[in-house]
A protein has these predicted regions:
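Extracytoplasmic surface signature
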Residues: 1-243
Length: 243
């Protein structure tokens, strides 16, 4: 895989690339940081620390239809840090404890018209979301989910959240990013072990167990993606794999 050395990847505004030469704004943008982006039912969804999008009140989450921004119901009561689409619904995770006026625990889903609490909850902040093997996966600052120990990462199964191989460890085990590479789920963050195996800030899950990616990365990883068939990681680190 390929490593890109970078600072933490936090977006502080919204722009679109109109062509290969120029950037342009999406209306008036937001009044505070944007932490997460995804596409849901043909619209761009943004989540973050903002309470205004394009001059319209929007509590921490908003949608862009190509012309203007609008809120998703009453939004959430605190910042949104992660977004994904699962089973036809938009899933949001973050620091919030209510969504659309409904009490939730750091995660909720939007069905196109309203928020619900059908995903149960986790014990603390959700920093990353993805779908792996047709199951929702959440990572973050939580040691427990549905009152069970999961150690910073869990998958949603019928009836609740489930641990993934014992989760992550180290002096700080938080998972900050989730991605895919080949048939594996990739997790990255503060942790220095995964499933009891040494794994410096990045590890892969094959559906049954965790393993390291080489000697790992020297410090915190905040972002993962793929480009040209390679895994790209960004964060606060200055070396990776001994390089």
């Amino acid at each position: 895989f390929t490593i890109i050395l970078s600072a933490a990847l936090i977006i502080s505004g919204i722009s679109q690339q109109a062509n290969s030469q120029n950037w342009s704004g999406l209306s008036y943008g937001m009044d505070n940081w944007v932490h997460a982006l995804t596409v849901y039912k043909g619209e761009l969804i943004a989540g973050g620390q903002f309470t205004n999008a394009g001059g319209v009140p929007a509590n921490y989450i908003a949608r862009w239809n190509g012309i203007s921004w609008s809120p998703l119901g009453a939004g959430t009561n605190a910042e949104v840090d992660a977004l994904c689409v699962f089973n036809g619904k938009l899933v949001a995770g973050g620091r919030f404890t209510s969504a659309g006026g409904i009490e939730v625990n750091f995660i909720s889903q939007w069905n196109g018209t309203s928020w619900d609490d059908q995903l149960g909850g986790v014990g603390s902040i959700v920093a990353a979301l993805t779908v792996y093997n047709n199951k929702l996966v959440a990572g973050g600052y939580f040691a427990n989910a549905d009152d069970q120990p999961v150690n910073y990462i869990a998958t949603r199964v019928s009836g609740g959240w489930q641990s993934m191989g014992g989760g992550m460890g180290g002096s700080q085990g938080q998972v900050m990013a989730l991605g895919h590479y080949g048939s594996d789920l990739i997790a990255a963050g503060f942790f220095t072990s995964a499933g009891g195996v040494p794994a410096n800030h990045i590890a892969k899950w094959n559906g049954t167990s965790w393993s390291p990616l080489g000697s790992g990365i020297s410090n915190i990883v905040y972002s993962l993606t793929q480009y040209n068939g390679e895994l790209i990681a960004g964060g606060l680190f200055l070396s990776a794999g001994g390089v």
